[in-house]
């Protein structure tokens, strides 16, 4: 499409389309794709380090499989701000909420990566917990029935309070 005859990028793309390539009218697949977008934005914006969003990720923008549309001066590369759909408005609101959480909770903006080692409080800098508050063990990580996960970040090294992030996919 961009005149590069596939010389401008890799074909080693890691994508998951929920069983259908390209656009679909299947509402179940569309719902699953939107859930994946929210989950991945949450993973990115609540993770350590500098979050790297691509222009339009906050509204689920697609370039229809073109991983390098730099030379496209058309709808493929434009951001459709004047005509976003309700699901895109919802995704944008989710992104805003996640960035607000990141700004409000210093423990999510650490200057160091987690080690799992105890901090001056005696607690590990990060703990992974089951829904019942017990530590995740190998069996919990491997259990396909596990639908909840909690991350407890000890904020002491940064002079902030601890932060608990709870992720629950039950019923979704």
Tell me the role of every PLM-derived stretch.
Residues 1-172:
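Loop/helix patches that line or flank the sugar-binding groove of alpha-linked glycan CAZymes
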């Amino acid at each position: 499409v961009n005149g590069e005859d596939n010389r401008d990028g890799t074909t080693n793309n890691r994508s998951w389309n929920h069983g259908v390539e390209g656009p679909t009218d299947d509402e179940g697949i569309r719902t699953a794709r939107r859930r994946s977008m929210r989950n991945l934005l949450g993973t990115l914006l609540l993770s350590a380090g500098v979050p790297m969003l691509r222009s339009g990720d906050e509204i689920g923008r697609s370039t229809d499989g073109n991983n390098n549309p730099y030379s496209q001066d058309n709808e493929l590369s434009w951001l459709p701000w004047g005509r976003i759909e309700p699901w895109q408005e919802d995704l944008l609101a989710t992104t805003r909420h996640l960035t607000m959480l990141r700004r409000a909770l210093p423990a999510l903006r650490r200057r160091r990566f987690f080690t799992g080692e105890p901090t001056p409080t005696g607690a590990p800098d990060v703990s992974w917990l089951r829904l019942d508050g017990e530590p995740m063990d190998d069996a919990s990580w491997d259990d396909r029935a596990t639908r909840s996960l909690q991350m407890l970040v000890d904020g002491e090294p940064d002079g902030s309070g601890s932060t608990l992030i709870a992720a629950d996919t039950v019923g979704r």
